[in-house]
A protein has these predicted regions:
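Amphipathic coiled-coil/heptad-repeat helices and related helical stalk/stem segments
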Residues: 46, 206, 257-258, 293
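Surface-exposed substrate-engagement region within the catalytic domains
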Residues: 258-273, 277-304
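Short, basic, helix/turn surface patches
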Residues: 135-142, 326-336
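Low-complexity, Pro/Thr/Ser/Gly/Ala-rich linker/spacer regions in secreted
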Residues: 1-6, 332-336
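Glycan-recognition surfaces
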Residues: 241-257, 279, 333-336
Length: 336
């Protein structure tokens, strides 16, 4: 393990797992219309989940915050511009860090996701606004950063348990919401259900978020959960602290897990963590590959990756022993 992430004052392989949520897009802020409580209102279930992940050897938890805007966490005005975070969302961030302290784990909150780029819709009496118009317009994007990202970061920084904030994942798989750019033969293929923005607009969002997060929480690393190495060419100029690519069967067919980070297009000047891959005995079986979890993890360990977070606890909790086997074999190099 020639590289790693500093965890608990020592450089370690950042072994973790995607939570990624207990209630999709409602863990932070809750969703009263659907009778869903956030972390601070119903901490027992979240605490039990974190304890189970820790017991399985996971020390880093990737946890989604606002993958879309269905929750009561983000407040909006009549123009659908964000005006701030609810008291419950701020309390939920504080509680999440407290629970992380109790469980002995570190958090990497994922602030946004490509899911939020769906057009505005109303589902079961809940209006879910779209992030796309906010990203497209510089003035509205500034409100998004000032009124959502900034207070979230300030809440984390104000926590007495802020040391449990290991890093940030600014946005999950933004490539699915980027329009064809004409800049590379490996161009974007946006999800047809989403309202795509330009590459420049997406990079502006990421850059503006980075500025706030590094100011408010300077000890926490910044990353983006990249959908695939196919699009690594587009983001090498972003000054993120950690590369965080994702890999599933379709990616592995063309950009195999056996390659070192630099061979996949990720800058060697910063650590690379595999941020998503299936938590199952053969993670790439969706493309008929029979490589085992243990073999894949050992390859990343050997080839200089700084960590790995399989997907995900909510659906694959029965497979947590796969993580524990690896954690036990590596000892303190993989778990504080």
């Amino acid at each position: 393990m020639p590289t790693g992430i500093t965890i608990g004052c020592n450089k370690r392989f950042a072994l973790g797992v995607n939570y990624a949520w207990r209630n999709f897009s409602a863990d932070f802020g809750g969703l009263a219309t659907w009778s869903i409580q956030g972390v601070s209102a119903a901490p027992a279930g979240y605490a039990a989940d974190l304890a189970a992940m820790k017991a399985a050897g996971a020390s880093v938890i990737r946890w989604w915050v606002f993958p879309d805007f269905r929750s009561d966490g983000v407040q909006f005005d009549a123009n659908d511009d964000p005006t701030g975070l609810s008291a419950s969302a701020l309390a939920d961030m504080a509680k999440a860090l407290e629970l992380a302290q109790t469980a002995g784990v570190y958090l990497v909150p994922t602030i946004f996701s490509f899911d939020a780029f769906r057009p505005k819709q109303t589902t079961e009496n809940v209006t879910v606004r779209s992030i796309a118009p906010l990203v497209k317009a510089p003035a509205r994007r500034a409100k998004l950063v000032a009124n959502v990202v900034t207070p979230l970061a300030k809440a984390a920084a104000a926590s007495p348990h802020r040391a449990r904030l290991l890093g940030w994942d600014l946005i999950n798989e933004p490539e699915w919401a980027i329009a064809v750019s004409g800049q590379n033969s490996q161009d974007f293929t946006p999800n047809e259900e989403l309202t795509a923005v330009s590459l420049a607009e997406m990079k502006a969002l990421i850059t503006e978020m980075m500025g706030v997060l590094k100011t408010e929480t300077p000890a926490a690393f910044t990353s983006v959960g990249w959908a695939a190495a196919k699009w690594s060419w587009a983001f090498t100029d972003l000054a993120l602290d950690v590369n965080q690519p994702h890999i599933y069967g379709w990616v592995n067919q063309y950009w195999p897990y056996t390659r070192k980070p630099a061979e996949l297009g990720y800058p060697a000047t910063r650590p690379t963590i595999m941020g998503e891959f299936f938590l199952q005995s053969m993670p790439f079986s969706d493309s008929n590959a029979n490589d085992t979890f243990a073999v894949i993890m050992e390859s990343w360990w050997t080839n200089g990756y700084a960590g790995a977070w399989p997907w995900h606890h909510r659906e694959n909790a029965a497979n947590l022993p796969l993580i524990k086997t690896f954690a036990d074999a590596k000892g303190c190099q993989a778990k504080p």
